[in-house]
A protein has these predicted regions:
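N-terminal, active-site-proximal structural segment of metallo-dependent hydrolase catalytic domains
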Residues: 2-153
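Soluble catalytic domains of enzymes that build or remodel membrane lipids, polysaccharides, and related
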Residues: 108, 112, 121-132, 143-324
Length: 324
């Protein structure tokens, strides 16, 4: 059966007598709904199952609606649907387009690595080798177990003689650590710490944090209330931080788009967003779909950010260069 260019014309009417502008209204409606979700995601209510936060965790993926709707729009030869698709396309590009460009560049004098090593990681020694390949000045770890700690110390203590462990989080450093201690994030046990890293270029306050986990439940929605309260507590600690140069390394169990992390994200900037290349998704490691692991700063300049190769964890390690 021959297929000619005439079959692609848009000026004719379909079998129901509809023109290119009078068909495809359902597709157009779906396109405009996608645009509205992207543009007004902060207005999506969070009261029922924290649905707004759940949606914001995977917000970049809403852009996939554009190619999905584009195919039937072309098959229907609907000018209305195609015109409507311009809205979510432009909004998505304005929101996330800058993440697709490589923003790295410039010199650096400080490197940080962040990793949730996973309590079920059976080969933490190999994981530490992966982290050290980035030649970091500090390494932050979360979900450390008592059984894992000896193997971690065996790998790291030689190159990183200064370290502090509080509960299930730890920080290893090439430079002396002072003023170390736990940070209360209101969960009843220790999953955050603070330390001053005395670098050759001055002191940097480093926070390591592991926000409470979130769950998606059929009967309860996105259960994130405990994490949200912890974000408020950590945000308060950051507000009271006396040092001008601040670095936060952690598994925040939320993305930069998540409104619940605003007490933190309004004070600090993302290294990936400022100096990375791409979205830098870090979880799950088998098919990274969201960046819930963060390196964020205030008073220091990120010059590069990237993800490291997969380890035995369900999270990818992340790294960043800084100019102090």
């Amino acid at each position: 059966m021959a297929f000619g260019i005439g079959d692609l014309h848009w000026r004719g009417r379909d079998g129901r007598g509809r023109s290119t502008w009078s068909r495809g209204w359902v597709l157009a409606g779906l396109a405009l709904l996608t645009a509205a979700i992207l543009a007004f995601h902060r207005q999506v209510p969070d009261e029922i199952g924290n649905f707004g936060s759940l949606m914001e965790t995977f917000l970049p993926w809403f852009g996939l609606a554009v190619p999905v709707l584009l195919v039937p729009a072309l098959l229907r030869r609907s000018a209305t649907a195609l015109a409507a698709l311009l809205a979510p396309t432009l909004i998505w590009v304005m929101m996330f387009g800058s993440l697709l460009t490589d923003k790295s560049g410039g010199g650096y004098d400080f490197t940080a690595v962040q990793h949730n090593i996973s309590a079920t990681n059976q080969d933490v020694g190999s994981s530490m080798d992966t982290l050290m390949q980035a030649k970091p000045d500090v390494i932050a770890l979360e979900e450390i177990t008592g059984a894992q700690l000896p193997a971690i110390r065996q790998k790291l203590d030689g190159a990183y003689p200064y370290h502090v462990v509080e509960g299930t989080v730890g920080l290893w450093s090439k430079y002396p650590l002072t003023d170390t201690g736990p940070v209360d994030i209101k969960i009843g046990w220790t999953r955050a710490l603070r330390a001053t890293v005395d670098t050759p270029n001055g002191a940097v306050a480093v926070y390591v944090a592991h926000m409470p986990s979130v769950r998606v439940k059929f009967d309860g929605g996105f259960t994130a209330n405990q994490r949200n309260h912890s974000a408020e507590a950590l945000g308060e600690a950051l507000t009271k931080e006396p040092l001008k140069r601040v670095l936060l390394l952690g598994d925040l169990n939320g993305t930069m788009n998540d409104r619940a992390l605003a007490p933190i994200t309004m004070q600090l900037r993302s290294a990936q967003g400022s100096a990375g290349d791409g979205f830098g998704f870090s979880w799950p490691s088998t098919f990274p779909s969201a960046r819930i692991d963060q390196i964020m700063s205030r008073g220091i300049t990120p010059t590069s950010a990237w993800t490291l190769p997969e380890t035995g964890s369900d999270h990818l390690p992340i790294a960043a260069h800084f100019q102090l």
